[in-house]
């Protein structure tokens, strides 16, 4: 379903938080939404892989990578795993790699920057905890909406039929 974050902000101005405009789109889907699942890690993606193995239908993975852009937390293999398991999208407060492959996958991916260096594969980090970046706090079970214009967050699902 097509979403327009600008229109959603107009309709739900008092209900949504707007993430600072620091992200670029790298996936093959330009707009996506779903229930938030969080991971907090630093330059390692083992825990990300574990979470992406879960059923992702109706879910968006929000990764707090500390804003580090020295290693790509999401690569083509992890993005394909997300597609295979039905994830709607991935937001990375950090870097991604293999962007030529990412843009051909049927998933939304927003991140700070691309870099060719891979993350280590340790499972260090935490999941399903509140994470804070971009001027907002993301809680597991919040709802996130993203398009090429921006990313917004709501505690309740928004009516997309308006």
Curated annotation (Swiss-Prot):
Domain of life: Bacteria
Gene Ontology CC: cytoplasm
GO molecular-function terms, A-Z: endoribonuclease inhibitor activity; enzyme binding
Cellular localisation: Cytoplasm
InterPro entries, A to Z: RraA, RraA/RraA-like, RraA/RraA-like_sf, RraA_gpbac
Pfam hit, one: RraA-like
Example GO biological process: regulation of RNA metabolic process
Primary location class: cytoplasm
Annotated keywords: Cytoplasm
Function summary: Globally modulates RNA abundance by binding to RNase E (Rne) and regulating its endonucleolytic activity. Can modulate Rne action in a substrate-dependent manner by altering the composition of the degradosome. Modulates RNA-binding and helicase activities of the degradosome.
Assembly notes: Homotrimer. Binds to both RNA-binding sites in the C-terminal region of Rne and to RhlB.
PANTHER family membership: 4-HYDROXY-4-METHYL-2-OXOGLUTARATE ALDOLASE 3-RELATED, REGULATOR OF RIBONUCLEASE ACTIVITY A
Family statement: Belongs to the RraA family.
HAMAP family from the UniProt entry: RraA (MF_00471)
Protein name (database record): Regulator of ribonuclease activity A
Species of the source: Haemophilus influenzae (strain ATCC 51907 / DSM 11121 / KW20 / Rd)
Taxonomic path: Bacteria, Pseudomonadati, Pseudomonadota, Gammaproteobacteria, Pasteurellales
Gene: rraA
